[in-house]
Amino acid sequence: MRKKISIIGAGFVGSTTAHWLAAKELGDIVLLDIVEGVPQGKALDLYEASPIEGFDVRVTGTNNYADTANSDVIVVTSGAPRKPGMSREDLIKVNADITRACISQAAPLSPNAVIIMVNNPLDAMTYLAAEVSGFPKERVIGQAGVLDAARYRTFIAMEAGVSVEDVQAMLMGGHGDEMVPLPRFSTISGIPVSEFIAPDRLAQIVERTRKGGGEIVNLLKTGSAYYAPAAATAQMVEAVLKDKKRVMPVAAYLTGQYGLNDIYFGVPVILGAGGVEKILELPLNEEEMALLNASAKAVRATLDTLKSL
């Protein structure tokens, strides 16, 4: 029997995630959105590409949560973008309401699913999804680090003039300006990245990575990134459905790791069929720990705002 993946939110990130997943033939895909016709149209369009691209998976669009029942993975991309004049608190409230609505309807229909959150503010929305679903924390995770690491790896490859395939990089922390790229744990085919790139240039690359999402928003003028976020999400879905035991940074629930408790936070994990199968604790130095704690403080502030609403 084929696996089933439900994607809630048929916007750019949701529909592009469906595209990457179909190309990988990971399972049948259900694309759900509240707007009538949009998920149906996008799903049909994608499904009609299957004879050309040769993927044998069904892609269906719906407005009905009943069609998501018995999913193996649920991906949540639904959320409102920040509009001019909107405070951070306003955005948190709007997206919290959307997340509650999505999870409260989808989770009971797929009690054994792994939930992957892709909406912002990522760490807080993942915390909320875990709370609303009642799922074991290891089966509710956030996609941020895979995308941020991909951007970091891209910039390192561009600077060093090497294949992106040979760049391995790790970063931690919250998604956004407070992320913590870790040059010390970044290599090119096992060779420390510092052998290729001078410290001042590496510092600039770290800063560009932190602002990676904003850079694309500024270039597009309307909208935000979706190819890379969707590809990152598809990679996580693949790790779960194929039980690949991939080592990747995801927003996971911490219970004392890195001195942090009761928080969803970007850390390296082993990702497999059970979701987060192990959280890896890296031997961080004082400077790295200071950056990590500052990042945790920012994530905690967002979480406190969410809890106060």
Curated annotation (Swiss-Prot):
User: In the record, what terms sit under GO molecular function?
Assistant: L-lactate dehydrogenase activity; L-malate dehydrogenase (NAD+) activity
**Which top EC class is named for this enzyme in its record?**
oxidoreductase
The positions annotated for binding NAD(+) are: 9-14, 33, 95, 118-120
Q: Where is the active site?
A: 175 (proton acceptor)
Q: Which Enzyme Commission number(s) are on file for it? A: 1.1.1.37
Q: Which residues bind substrate?
A: 82, 88, 120, 151
Record SUPFAM superfamilies: LDH C-terminal domain-like, NAD(P)-binding Rossmann-fold domains
Q: Which keywords does this Swiss-Prot/TrEMBL entry list?
A: NAD, Oxidoreductase, Tricarboxylic acid cycle
Pfam families given for it?
Ldh_1_C, Ldh_1_N
Please give the catalytic activity noted in the UniProt record: (S)-malate + NAD(+) = oxaloacetate + NADH + H(+)
Tell me the Gene Ontology biological-process terms attached to this UniProt entry. lactate metabolic process; tricarboxylic acid cycle
Known HAMAP family for this protein? Malate_dehydrog_3
Task: Give the protein family.
Answer: Belongs to the LDH/MDH superfamily. MDH type 3 family.
PANTHER family named among the record's database cross-references: L-2-HYDROXYCARBOXYLATE DEHYDROGENASE (NAD(P)(+)), L-LACTATE DEHYDROGENASE
What role does this protein play? Catalyzes the reversible oxidation of malate to oxaloacetate.
**Protein name, entry field:** Malate dehydrogenase
Give the species: Chloroflexus aurantiacus (strain ATCC 29364 / DSM 637 / Y-400-fl)
Which gene is transcribed and translated to give this protein?
mdh
